[in-house]
Amino acid sequence: DAAFNGHNHAYERSHAVRGDAVDPTGTIYITVSPSGAAMDGNTGDWFTAATYADWADWGDLDAVAVWVLVTVDGATASARTMSLSDGVVDEFDL
């Protein structure tokens, strides 16, 4: 499973998490919101997957503007996170 949200002004992706532990059968949490307003990066005091090191799989510490392209083919899905300046910055399977 995957859960996408977009309130924090940074890009971050967790490992698959179930309950309070990393678990390959769990949900991947993706925040896709670094564009438009000022970007935060992953340095705040608030709790997010990227600030909890055991859960973080990828975080945008440089606060680059990105979008995510999700490709679904039958029962499989993959995602590529892209930026205008850097091209592909993250790739993962769902």
Which residues does each predicted region cover?
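Metal-dependent phosphoesterase/phosphodiesterase active-site architecture
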Residues: D1-A2, N8-L94
